[in-house]
Structures are given as structure tokens and as C-alpha cells.
């Protein structure tokens, strides 16, 4: 090992400068340069080891020197250095390099190494090319190079060339005798490589700490600050330096350059944790070892700007090698409970990204997103001639979010069954600890249009596909458009995951017919191969069994649900109710339950529970009114669940309960027969009604625009428009046809009488318009008194302004967590998030 390679190892871990005899060793046996230790004492009024955070009681001057370091430095100065054909005997490395560089000016290139070697390192300090710099990056010419183009650097064999910068892996820009120019890499042998860019990172958000005493080890910074990365602390935290301050910071708040990625990768804790970079970055040969000539002519053009590392983008030029080479960061579940709690505390962090707090059905919470490692996977393009489901068959579904603590007592069984489908089954420990990293970025489709309001935001067009690299804590996604290739952030509740639609009879999925009259009416039927008495439920066609408890549905993470698979049309067009259902599908930890014969969502149950697809031998039923209040029939504890059938035009609807963690049971429906629909209308009338409803729904969805920042769920506006188009505001709409899994037979039918026996009467239902074939019985309105626990400023005219302590009479609880009620203070009626009130 020569002197230069050894000195590269003897560097201060903080400032990365080479250590000298003045370096001090701490009681923990870590060695740092004296300048860094004095800077730490001056900024923090105490001395802690930057490596292990051990408190040092004595001052910097009282610390001992590193004896081993002093002996190594003395041995390097006294031992003759014999690097080969370049150096001369009796010289140390510094004087040899000075002699070789000054030979360009003082003597001929060939006798430079022998005539300029001297024992005193300062004898050649007058040479212009190396004045004031002990060592310059340089290379020795192996062959003569005459240059082929203007701007090329001409040199002869044996010349010492001062390296200025590296254009790419094949070309350098250097200087010989004051003449600058380009020359090929394989014509020279690198003696002293160019310095690597320092490991740095750029802040994406503000990172502040309110309790400075409790979080004194944290390093606060503002957005766009550039930090020097020191090391990785654990899976989710790194240590860095900003100005003269040293501390730890969350990895997910910054973006690393290539050098920092290598440092983070090397310091990765052992175990199956996710790496913070895109993998180990391969450096160029000239930056690590002496480059040997390949013996072949260079065929690559010098300005091709080929990548300096395996994971860098091909469009990055080498002139910008000292700039920030940014790649999407990674959100990793921390193995340190204190670090994870520090990230999750709502009052502890302030983030400059939009909407740090999102509203879920359980209140104001901050939930960490699942791990989303950034990989350099291939770009996903969908050929125009390929069918839509076939193009999606190769894509992996997104990871499930960690289960909320407000889940039902059967959350363990729910988590155990969350792995059904094409993925391997995940046990309860997988759901509560760290999810497995997905092998490639997730693919999402925009279900609502979104106009960007900041420079780093992406414009969303309905039906547009996106590759999501990162799911931020505030509910925003970072990804790239598969149509425009632009990279930016966008609200996560405006997109839905695109998952593979693989059906299997053993998994109990409900198939959906996309052609023929059955799909026109929205009736679902089993394939002939899966029919038979063994798979047909008795009575009303709903899989029997006791009440299936349901879990809380978090509205902020519906887009990461791998279980609620919504089958999208190839045309990309969706009705309002369909888009609402797609945006509010149940997350991974929620228990799937048997529903009416309108849902194509994968049905799965706990072990031992019978589960069957639904069979409907009848012809399609006429279109009913919008069933956007399907969850309003969910009773309280012990109450039955009344499922409303969705419109026939909706191919993918999700019948969800109201946001509550209380269990619900299914109503035992009344057996039906093909003769039960005696008041059926002709199919032609059904088509007309369907077209009319589509016009109403599409008009309601296009007239409304998303609200201002932070973007709330666009389904609120869409549903409000649908309510206004159906009739005056009031009790929720009810399905005129049979529910609870009954076949869609036309005609006026009443629900099961057990609905009246519920301990608490469900909200009343009434028909939305005259489109339905019949009207169900109107029940008197039941209002519930709620008290406002957190003030809420309205985001639109349809919302109520809530002040803490106000009394609100709730008329309706919607499935997306929003309530409709009347404020006692001023008598106004409107919408408000249910997590801001409590029942009294």
C-alpha cells in the first residue's frame, strides 16, 4: 500500500480531512481532528463523541493523542516510498508529486522523475502549477496523444498531467504546461485521483424540534438546506452536520447525493432492513484504484456523458458531478422505538410539505407510511393494442399500511387473513412490525383531475397512470407520470392503486361480466364451472355465518390497500359513485365481509368461515337511484347491517360501513325467486333511466372542482353534487330494490323485519328521485347530538364552521367519515368531518 492510499484511510470521520499528529483520541477510542472537537465544544458547550454520543468530561486540550496514528505518520515520512516507474527513491509522497508536477515547467517530461526528486518537501513550492497545494490530482501519460479535434490536449509519453475534472468515464479535462484540453482516460495512468464530492443531502422539508431539551441530539434544518452526512444511525435516522452543529435527522426528510448514498449504504444496519439508496453505487476505476490501460482504442465520444455510476441517470453530465445528484428518498420503519415515536409525534415535528395532519375516521392522527424502497426498475408502458387487464398482470400491488390501533378485537385474525390473493400470506407479526419491501414502484391511476398549485406538483388527469416512488407522511405521493415522464408530488387521495385482477374459485372472488345484458344491468353471476348447489348460498344468496366484525377504515391510506381491488374499465371512464367507491376502498387491515351482489372486490374471510360468490339467475334489473349512503344502514353494537345495492351502471362499488370500529352483523334476507319481481319494467325503460342517471352523475362530477390546499378528498364534492342532483338535502337515499344479497329483482320489496328490532334505529332512507321503480317506506329522521371537540374551518360553502364546544345534530353519517348535520348555534346545515365531533 503506497502513501496516498494509506493517507486516504487516515481521515477525520467528521470533516473528512486527513488526520495529523494533533488529532485527539476520546475515551471511547474514537479519533477526531482537533479542529472538529473544538467546533463541537463551541457550538454545544459540551463534548460528545460524534460516533457513539459518549459524553467526554475533560477538555479538548487534555485529551491524549493517538499514538498509533503518530507512529504511522512518522513511518510514512521516514520510510522510502517505491511506487514503481513514477517515483524516485529517497523521497516521500508529497515531494515526489511536487517534483513530478513541476517537471512540466522546469525540465523535460522524461527526466523529470529522476532529476526533481529531493528530500525536502518544500523545495518545489515555487512551481506555478502546484503552488500552495501539497497534492494535486494528476496522471502520467502512458502513450503519446496528438489530439483528434480542436480542444484536445496533446502530450507525450511520460508527461505528468494535472487533472481538472472528469467529463465522463472515458474522458478527462486536464492541463500540461499551462495548456488545457481533453484527453482519453485509457492514455494515462491515474496517480492521484480527483477528490470525490462530499457526502451531502438536501432537505426536502423543514425539520424542527419544539422540545429542545428532550431532542437536543436532533439537528433541525429548513427546507433546501444542504447538510453534510456523517453516518447512518439506524434504519430511519442519519447523523449529519449543518454549519457547526452536529446531530441526527430523519432520512425521509432529505435527498442524498451519490457520495452520501454510498455512505448510507455502507452504514446500513444488519438485517432485512431496506437500504436508503438505490443499491451500492459502483464508482469509476479512476476514483478508487489506479486505472490500467485496456489496450484498445477508445470508441466512445467524449461528450456522450455516460454515467459515472451504475445507478446515475444517463442525462447527467460530468461537469455537474459536484452538484446534488438526487434520487427519491426512502421512508423506512425505524427499528428504534424512540426514533419512530419522535417521527410520529404530531407536536414534535413541523413539515413544510402540504398537510402534515390528515383526517381519518378515528380522529386527527399521523400514521407512518409503509416502506417504499426506491429501485431503478424498468419503466412500465402499456401498449395500445394490449388489453388493460393483461398489461396490469405484471405489476405488483402496493404494500399494506400498518394496522391502526383502533382496530376491532379481531384485528389479529384480520391481519392474518390480509395476505390472501396472489401474494403470500402475511402473519400478524408482519402486519404489526415492518412490511416486506415491494420489489418495484407501485402503479397508480388518477381517479380525479388535479391542477398543480406549486412548482413541484404534478397535474393529474383522470385515467392517467403514475409510478409512485414514495408515500409521504402527510398523505402526498411522489412519483412520475407514465405519460409525460415528469416527476413531482401529488395528493394521494386523488389516485387509486392499479392491481392485478387475478380470479380464482378457491379465493372466493366475485367475477364481473363486462359484456352482454347482465353487465348492462350490473348483475353479477358465477361462471358455469363454479356453479352448483355447493357454492350457492341458501336463502337470499349471501354467505351465512355470524356477524363479521369490521375494522376502522383510514381515509388517508385507502390508496395503499392491497385487498380492496377495484377492477377498472379499459376505457378509463368512471361514474361518480364508482370513483367514490374506488377512492374509499377498505384498507388492508379491514375485514372483508359478504356484501350485496354488486361488488367485484376480492372477498376473503377468516379461517373457517364459509365464503361463496353470489348467484343471480334473473335478468338485469332496472336502474335504481344512487346508493351513496350504503353504509348508513349500519347499526350500532349488535345491530344488523343493511346493504344498499349500487346502481347498475357501477361495475366496481364498495359497500362500506360507517366509520366505526364496532361490529356489525348481516341481516338474514328473505329468499327470493324469479317470480318476486312482478312489477318489473321493460329493459328499454331501464336503458333510458340508466342514461339519465349517467348524465346527472357526470354533470355533478364535472361541475365541482377540488378544494384548496391541503386538498381534501374530492369524493366529498362529487357526492355533494350527486345529492343536490337527486333532490333536496335530507335523509340518505335508499335502494328501492332488495338488499342484503338478494338478487336484483325489480318491484317494490321491503327489507327484512329484523331491521326494526335493532337496539338503535339506523338512519332513515328515502328515494332520491323518481328514477327508481318503487319507493321504499320513509322513516322519521333520527338526529344524534354531537359535541365539537376540535374547531374546524370550512373549506367550501357546503361545509359547516365548527367551534370547540358547539352542539351539532347529525342527520347522516357517510361512509367516507363525513357527517351531515345542523349546527345548533346558527341553525345552518352542512357537512363536516366526523372526527372533529363526539357523540353525547
Swiss-Prot record:
Gene Ontology MF terms in the entry: MAP-kinase scaffold activity; ubiquitin protein ligase activity; zinc ion binding
Pathway the protein contributes to: Protein modification; protein ubiquitination
Sequence ranges of Polar residues compositional bias: 283-292
Entry EC no(s): 2.3.2.27
Zn finger (RING-type) start-end: 12-53
Biased composition (Pro residues): 616-625
Region described as Interaction with RAC1: 292-362
PTM annotation (Phosphoserine): residues: 304, 709
GO biological process: negative regulation of apoptotic process; neuron migration; positive regulation of JNK cascade; positive regulation of proteasomal ubiquitin-dependent protein catabolic process; protein autoubiquitination; protein ubiquitination; regulation of CD4-positive, alpha-beta T cell differentiation; regulation of CD8-positive, alpha-beta T cell proliferation
Domain SH3 per the UniProt entry, residue ranges: 134-193, 196-259, 439-500, 781-840
Alphabetically ordered keywords of this record: Cell projection, Cytoplasm, Golgi apparatus, Metal-binding, Phosphoprotein, Repeat, SH3 domain, Transferase, Ubl conjugation, Ubl conjugation pathway, Zinc, Zinc-finger
Record's comment describing the protein's domains: The RING finger domain is required for ubiquitin ligase activity and autoubiquitination.
Protein family according to the UniProt entry: Belongs to the SH3RF family.
Descriptive protein name: E3 ubiquitin-protein ligase SH3RF1
Amino acid at each position: 500500500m503506497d502513501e496516498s492510499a494509506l493517507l486516504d484511510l487516515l481521515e477525520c470521520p467528521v470533516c473528512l480531512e486527513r488526520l495529523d499528529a494533533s488529532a485527539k483520541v476520546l475515551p471511547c477510542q474514537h479519533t477526531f481532528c482537533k479542529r472538529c472537537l473544538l467546533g463541537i465544544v463551541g457550538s454545544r458547550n459540551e463534548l460528545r463523541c460524534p460516533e457513539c454520543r459518549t459524553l467526554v468530561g475533560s477538555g479538548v486540550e487534555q485529551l491524549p493523542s493517538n499514538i498509533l496514528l503518530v507512529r504511522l505518520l512518522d513511518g510514512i515520512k521516514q520510510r522510502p516510498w517505491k511506487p514503481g516507474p513514477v517515483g524516485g527513491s529517497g523521497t516521500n509522497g508529497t515531494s515526489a508529486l511536487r517534483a513530478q508536477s513541476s517537471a512540466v515547467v522546469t525540465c523535460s517530461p522524461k527526466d523529470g522523475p529522476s532529476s526533481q526528486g529531493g528530500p525536502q518537501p518544500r523545495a518545489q513550492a515555487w512551481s506555478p502549477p502546484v503552488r500552495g497545494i501539497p497534492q494535486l490530482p494528476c496522471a502520467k501519460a502512458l502513450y503519446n496523444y496528438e489530439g483528434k479535434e480542436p480542444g484536445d490536449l496533446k502530450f507525450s509519453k511520460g508527461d505528468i498531467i494535472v487533472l481538472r475534472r472528469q467529463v465522463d468515464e472515458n474522458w478527462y479535462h486536464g492541463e500540461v504546461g499551462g495548456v488545457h484540453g481533453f484527453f482519453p482516460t485509457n492514455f494515462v495512468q491515474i496517480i492521484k485521483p480527483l477528490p470525490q464530492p462530499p457526502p451531502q443531502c438536501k432537505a426536502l422539508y423543514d425539520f424542527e424540534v419544539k422540545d429542545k431539551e428532550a431532542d437536543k441530539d436532533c439537528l433541525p434544518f429548513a427546507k433546501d438546506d444542504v447538510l453534510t452526512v456523517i453516518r447512518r444511525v439506524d434504519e430511519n435516522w442519519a447523523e449529519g452536520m449543518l454549519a457547526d452543529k452536529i446531530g441526527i435527522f430523519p432520512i425521509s426528510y432529505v435527498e442524498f447525493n451519490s457520495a452520501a448514498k454510498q455512505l448510507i449504504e455502507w452504514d446500513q444496519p444488519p438485517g432485512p432492513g431496506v437500504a436508503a439508496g438505490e443499491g451500492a453505487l459502483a464508482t469509476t476505476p479512476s476514483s478508487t484504484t489506479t486505472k490500467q490501460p485496456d489496450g484498445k482504442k477508445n470508441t466512445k465520444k467524449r461528450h456522450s456523458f455516460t454515467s459515472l455510476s451504475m445507478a446515475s441517470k444517463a442525462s447527467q453530465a460530468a461537469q455537474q458531478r459536484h452538484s446534488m445528484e438526487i434520487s427519491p428518498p426512502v421512508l423506512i420503519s425505524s427499528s428504534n422505538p424512540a426514533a419512530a415515536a419522535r417521527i410520529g409525534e404530531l407536536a414534535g415535528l413541523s413539515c413544510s410539505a402540504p398537510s402534515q395532519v390528515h383526517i381519518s375516521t378515528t380522529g386527527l392522527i399521523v400514521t407512518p407510511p409503509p416502506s417504499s424502497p426506491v429501485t431503478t426498475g424498468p419503466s412500465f408502458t402499456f401498449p395500445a393494442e394490449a388489453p388493460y387487464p393483461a398489461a396490469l398482470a405484471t405489476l405488483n400491488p402496493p404494500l399494506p399500511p400498518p394496522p391502526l390501533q383502533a382496530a376491532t378485537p379481531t384485528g389479529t385474525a384480520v391481519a392474518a387473513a390480509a395476505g390472501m390473493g396472489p401474494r403470500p400470506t402475511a402473519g400478524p407479526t408482519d402486519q404489526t412490525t415492518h412490511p416486506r419491501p415491494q420489489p418495484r414502484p407501485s402503479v397508480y391511476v388518477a381517479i380525479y383531475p388535479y391542477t398543480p398549485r406549486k412548482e413541484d406538483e404534478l397535474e393529474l388527469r383522470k385515467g392517467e397512470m403514475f409510478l409512485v416512488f414514495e408515500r409521504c407522511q402527510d398523505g402526498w405521493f411522489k412519483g412520475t407520470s407514465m405519460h409525460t415522464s415528469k416527476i413531482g408530488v401529488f395528493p394521494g387521495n386523488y389516485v387509486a392503486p392499479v392491481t392485478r385482477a387475478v380470479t380464482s374459485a378457491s379465493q372466493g372472488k366475485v367475477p364481473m361480466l363486462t359484456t352482454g345484458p347482465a353487465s348492462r344491468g350490473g348483475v353479477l353471476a358465477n361462471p358455469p364451472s363454479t356453479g352448483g348447489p355447493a357454492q350457492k348460498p341458501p336463502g337470499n344468496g349471501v354467505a351465512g355465518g355470524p356477524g363479521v366484525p369490521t375494522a376502522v377504515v383510514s381515509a388517508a391510506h385507502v390508496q395503499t390497500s392491497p385487498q380492496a381491488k377495484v377492477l377498472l374499465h379499459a376505457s378509463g371512464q368512471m361514474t361518480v359513485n364508482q370513483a367514490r367507491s374506488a377512492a374509499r376502498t377498505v384498507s388492508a387491515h379491514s375485514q372483508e365481509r359478504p356484501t350485496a351482489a354488486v361488488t367485484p372486490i376480492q372477498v376473503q374471510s377468516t379461517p373457517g368461515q364459509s365464503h361463496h360468490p353470489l348467484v343471480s339467475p334473473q335478468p338485469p334489473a332496472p336502474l335504481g337511484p344512487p346508493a351513496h349512503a350504503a353504509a348508513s344502514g349500519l347499526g350500532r353494537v349488535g345491530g344488523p347491517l343493511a346493504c344498499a345495492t349500487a346502481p347498475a351502471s357501477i361495475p366496481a362499488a364498495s359497500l362500506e360501513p360507517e366509520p366505526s370500529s364496532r361490529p356489525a352483523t348481516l341481516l338474514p334476507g328473505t329468499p327470493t325467486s324469479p317470480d318476486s319481481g312482478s312489477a318489473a319494467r321493460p329493459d328499454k325503460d331501464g336503458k333510458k333511466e340508466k342514461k339519465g342517471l349517467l348524465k346527472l352523475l357526470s354533470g355533478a362530477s364535472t361541475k365541482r372542482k377540488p378544494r384548496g390546499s391541503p386538498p381534501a378528498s374530492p369524493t366529498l364534492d362529487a357526492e355533494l353534487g350527486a345529492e343536490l342532483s337527486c333532490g333536496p338535502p335530507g335523509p340518505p337515499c335508499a335502494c328501492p330494490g332488495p338488499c342484503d344479497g338478494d338478487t336484483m329483482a325489480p318491484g317494490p320489496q321491503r327489507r327484512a323485519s329484523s331491521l326494526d328490532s335493532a337496539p338503535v334505529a339506523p338512519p332513515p332512507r328515502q328515494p332520491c328521485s323518481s328514477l327508481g321503480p318503487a319507493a321504499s317506506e320513509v322513516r322519521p329522521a333520527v338526529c344524534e347530538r354531537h359535541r365539537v371537540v376540535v374547531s374546524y374551518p370550512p373549506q367550501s360553502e357546503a361545509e359547516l364552521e365548527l367551534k370547540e364546544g358547539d352542539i351539532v345534530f347529525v342527520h347522516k353519517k357517510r361512509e367516507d367519515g363525513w357527517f351531515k348535520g345542523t349546527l345548533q348555534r346558527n341553525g345552518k346545515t352542512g357537512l363536516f368531518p366526523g372526527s372533529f365531533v363526539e357523540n353525547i
